[in-house]
Each structure stands twice: as C-alpha cells, then as structure tokens.
Amino acid sequence: MNQFLGLNVNPRENFMLSVKHEMPYWLPCSLFDSSVTIIQHGLKERCDYGEDDWGVKWERKVMRADSFPVNHPLDSPDMVEDYPLPSPNKSRIMECAKKTASNIDRNRVVLVGDNGWGLFERTWLLMGMPRFFVWSFRYPDALKRLIERVAEIKIILTEWLITERGIDIIEYGDDWGMEDRLLLSLEKWRTFIKPWQAKLYRVAKDHDVFVSQHSDGRVENFIPRPHRDRRRYTEHSERM
C-alpha cells in the first residue's frame, strides 16, 4: 500500500472505497489526486468539420461553440439492414487506448474506459431526432433493429476495453432528459433503449467491472422509487 498525503492509502484505493460505498479517506477528485485516467477508443464519433466514422457530417459554425450535425444519412427503414456502420475491429480504433493505458501506474490510478456516444444519441444522429420519434410509432421494428446494430458495436468496444486494456470502470453516456422531463417517454425508453442498455451493463458485470452512466437532463423517472424516497432508503439502505 502506497502512502498519499501521509495516509496509508493511495488515490486508487481511496477511489475504490467510495465506489464500493465504503468510507473514503477523502472525497475522490481526479483534478486533485490524479486518481482516474480515462481512455477512449479511436472511433470518430464527432468532428469539427467533415464526416465521422458513422457517416454523419459535422460543421462548427461558431468558433466559441461545439460542432453540430448537418446531415442525417439514414432516411428510410429500407436502409437499416445494409447501412455501413463502422467496424470496431480496426487497429486504428484502439491505438489511442493502448497508448494511454500503457503509460499509467495501475497500482495508483483507476482506469476508466469511455464507450462514447450512447444508443439513443448515436441512433438519432444517424436518422435525425424527429425521425427517431416518428419511427418509434410508424416503424418500430426498423428502429429496434438500428439500435441493435449500434449496440452490437458498442458491446464489442466495451469487451475490448475490458479484456485488452483491463479497465476498472466502463463509462456510458446518453442524454435521455431535458431540463424538466424525459426526452422520450418511460414506456418508449423501456421498449427501445433498455433491452440493449441492459446488455451493455451485463458485459461489464460479467467481468466484474463497474458501470458509470451519464445522462444530461431530468431523468429521475428511470430510478426505482425506493431510491428517491428518503425515509424508505434510510430504512432499507443495507438491502438496497
């Protein structure tokens, strides 16, 4: 065990205490204690100008802002099966992660693998958000198949980050919420997103890897009610 700030614990050990809901010696903060390094696959999910690896074109129209998608190439249910999605097996895709992971002290640092844009985001970027919602009513099977194809790539990326780079945590990000509500109904989320989101989680759990899930917006409706009820949480926290 290496010391940090005179304590008999190092940043990695302290971080993992917090993740396991034990009492850390200090509040983990990677900006302060360098406890976390994030590695990313090399699949181009976004760019300032030009086309990403999924066939979506981007432009940065205001230099003080991020780039925005300017086309959504998938415009017909007939395109879903044969649309050329990127191959995650190319050596270029993982080269960035290899280089970063090889330069850190795994005894002192938690290694987090960033899976990239989530199932909802990546799917609506391919087709446009209005079309996503229209298809959820008119062409639900085509939408499910497209999400499935995206998820298959994301699963391969997760498996590679776990088995080849030995990450401790996989980070998934998908913006499901707006300022005051969900972007899609809870029923739609459970129908189209949840089945494959669960498979992404299962890949991590099968390898004893922790999951970090990010979402912008107000998404409390996804969280089972006992976890939002302070009295019940206090009463049953050990069982939860």
What are these model-predicted stretches?
Residues M1-S34, R60, P84-M240:
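Active-site loop segments of alpha/beta catalytic cores
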Residues G55:
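Ligand-binding pocket scaffold of soluble enzyme catalytic domains
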